[in-house]
């Protein structure tokens, strides 16, 4: 079987999966926390649904759902709290990440697209974490609309 043998290959595969899985778990936890910080009536998707991102292949499509539903939930929550925010918060960079991941399967474009997808994923993650931190701030008494 060569120099490292079957056991060595198995160990390398486990290490590789761990390297990929650990950041994904922290990413999902960030998404879940951001959704939990939205009022239940503003959650377009259940916070637990973020864990569907852990399913290989399915996550290629679920990423689009997560990004669009997260943007809708955040937009509704920021509107409820009367906090000014961009329309569909995080949606553009999130969709760029999802599209670049799919483009990573195209021969010759694969490596540059995967690198760009990694950058967009990190930017999206940081952006959602920032929105989540904003929502974690104590809720000020909302002014009543003037009738």
Feature roles, as predicted:
Residues 13-18, 56-59, 103-114:
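Short hydrophobic membrane-inserting alpha-helices and related fusion/pore-forming segments
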């Amino acid at each position: 079987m060569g120099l490292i043998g079957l056991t060595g290959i198995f160990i390398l595969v486990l290490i590789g999966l761990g390297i990929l899985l650990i950041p994904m778990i922290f990413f999902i936890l960030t998404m879940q926390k951001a959704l939990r910080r939205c009022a239940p009536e503003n959650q377009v998707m259940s916070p637990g649904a973020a864990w569907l991102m852990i399913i290989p292949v399915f996550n290629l499509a679920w990423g689009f759902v997560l990004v669009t539903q997260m943007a809708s939930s955040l937009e509704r929550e920021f509107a409820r709290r009367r906090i000014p925010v961009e329309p569909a918060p995080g949606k553009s960079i999130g969709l760029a990440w999802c599209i670049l991941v799919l483009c990573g399967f195209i021969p010759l474009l694969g490596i540059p697209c995967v690198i760009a997808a990694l950058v967009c994923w990190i930017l999206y993650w940081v952006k959602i974490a920032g929105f989540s931190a904003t929502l974690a701030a104590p809720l000020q008494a909302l002014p009543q609309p003037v009738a």
